[in-house]
Regions:
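S-adenosyl-L-methionine
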Residues: 1-56, 61-103
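Local beta-strand N-terminus motif with an aromatic residue
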Residues: 27, 56-57, 106-108, 149
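Feature marks short, surface-exposed loop/turn motifs that line or immediately flank catalytic pockets
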Residues: 39, 67, 89, 117-119, ...
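Conserved beta-strand segments of alpha/beta enzyme cores
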Residues: 56-59, 78-81, 221-223
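Conserved acidic E/D residue at the C-terminus of a beta-strand in Rossmann-like folds
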Residues: 59-65, 84, 155-159
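Class I S-adenosyl-L-methionine
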Residues: 96-105, 117-268
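N-terminal Rossmann-like NAD(P) cofactor-binding module of classical short-chain dehydrogenase/reductase
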Residues: 110-112, 153
Length: 268
């Protein structure tokens, strides 16, 4: 992660967490997936009102031992897992959440996922995509089921919204552009967990059946933005997709830009 990316995430997080805390005086606890060296976690822990911290990172996951070592040096009190998020045993995180809830009834838990973006990004050009990498978002359902977060925050390249099927050569099928993205968003909103052992087609069929029969209630509200780092004071133009899923008692808020390209807009 570059300094610019870390700064960008920090600005967004500081604004968002302050708004959440002011609304209900809640304390926010983060589980940081794909945590890297800790840019997002730093943004979380710099959020404060006055001199009081309002958010804390309690668990971090990354497969790279060097990234985890750096993260641990800066955030020594969090649980650290040098593991593949697809196979991580979630029991230690779930047990920690239970302890925090017992001590702090105002605790709210946030699942942050900066999903691997290489196989969505347009920077990859016409090269084949890795289908396993593109399905990492599906592995979040296990975390949603066991952790039951109050808020889920996703960060990725803007092409994440184009997530669709691949052909036999691993190339995106243009007519299916965005199909899997939209279906994934719906599943998260309705808390629909893919049934283990079923093929994708069966998942789709079951989900549609449950929706038509009004057998599913919406668990999360959803909103997203494409935000540009340059609009928040960074020295480069870098667009990113940010998505938020919030339970009914949690607000979804977004920061207002602090800078503009033409220099003529006013902040007041």
């Amino acid at each position: 992660m570059t300094h610019t990316e870390a700064l960008f995430k920090t600005i967004i997080l500081l604004h968002h967490l302050a708004e959440l805390h002011k609304k209900d005086n809640v304390d926010l606890y983060y589980i940081d997936l794909f945590c890297g060296a800790g840019g997002t976690s730093t943004g979380v822990e710099q959020a404060n009102i006055g001199s009081g911290s309002i958010a804390k990172v309690i668990a971090c996951v990354n497969h790279d031992k060097n990234a985890i070592a750096s993260h641990m040096a800066n955030h020594p009190y969090a649980l650290h897992f040098t593991e593949d998020m697809r196979t991580l045993d979630l029991a230690p995180i779930v047990n920690l959440i239970k302890k925090i809830k017992f001590r702090n009834p105002n605790a709210r838990f946030v699942l942050w996922a900066s999903l691997e973006c290489t196989n969505f990004s347009k920077a990859k050009g016409g090269q084949a995509r890795d289908p396993d990498s593109r399905t990492l978002a599906d592995h979040l359902f296990r975390y949603i089921e066991e952790i039951n977060p109050d808020l889920i925050q996703i960060e990725n390249v803007e092409e994440f919204m184009c997530w669709g099927d691949l052909d036999e050569n691993g190339k995106p099928i243009s007519k299916d552009k965005g199909r899997l993205y939209l279906r994934w968003i719906e599943r998260v909103q309705y808390g629909y967990l893919p049934c283990r052992g079923y093929q994708q087609e069966r998942h789709d069929e079951l989900f549609d059946t449950f929706r038509r029969g009004n057998l599913l209630d919406k668990v999360y509200d959803f909103d997203h933005r494409i935000l540009n780092a340059a609009d928040f004071g960074a020295y480069t133009s870098r667009k990113r997709f940010f998505g938020q899923f919030a339970k009914k008692d949690m607000p979804i808020v977004w920061p207002e830009p602090t800078h503009c390209k033409d220099g003529e807009q006013t902040l007041f």
